Amino acid sequence: MDLRALIRLVPDFPRPGILFRDMTPLLQDPAGFRAAIEQLAAGTTGMGSLDYVVGIESRGFILGAALAQHLGLGFVPVRKPGKLPPPVLSQTYSLEYGQDQLQLHAHALRPGERVLIVDDVIATGGTAAATAQLVAQSGAEVGGFAFLIELAFLSGCKALPPGIPAHVVMVEEGN
């Protein structure tokens, strides 16, 4: 199935110069959504035993929860500040113009557990790398990453921790 045909390209959103990838049509298409989850799952076969899927707010929740269900794993959300009740672990990371932060329930993961980090798009890799740092703070281990789309021109996969497999369903070369 051609998943690209189910991704709507929206120019100049959320600001001028950005070509936004809207996955709403993909989510509305039962066969397309199922194919996306199956293709994400196919990339996890070489990642070893996994205990949880960690989904990054917000579209990583949609894909991550569906993928967790498909793989028979639990789901753990990583959220923006102030969305989770305490205690939480926090990780600050750099953006192009400033900083942002992500949070994880302090007791959601335990030492020795292995997780798959999932998001819809990897652009610069900052959000995924910060999520990996949160997982490390918890004592758990990142077994792999899975993304529906990689914006290759931003080199985000190079920002991920070395030696950890990353699976991408679709690679976009241009902005």
Curated annotation (Swiss-Prot):
InterPro entries: Ade_phspho_trans (IPR005764), PRibTrfase_dom (IPR000836), PRTase-like (IPR029057), UPRTase/APRTase (IPR050054). Pathway: Purine metabolism; AMP biosynthesis via salvage pathway; AMP from adenine: step 1/1. One of its GO terms (cellular component) is cytoplasm. It is an enzyme of class 2 (transferase). The keyword Cytoplasm applies. Its EC number is 2.4.2.7. GO terms for biological process: adenine salvage; AMP salvage; purine ribonucleoside salvage. It catalyses: AMP + diphosphate = 5-phospho-alpha-D-ribose 1-diphosphate + adenine. Keywords: Cytoplasm, Glycosyltransferase, Purine salvage, Transferase. It is found in: Cytoplasm. Belongs to the purine/pyrimidine phosphoribosyltransferase family. HAMAP family: Aden_phosphoribosyltr. Homodimer. This is Adenine phosphoribosyltransferase. It comes from Synechococcus sp. (strain JA-2-3B'a(2-13)).
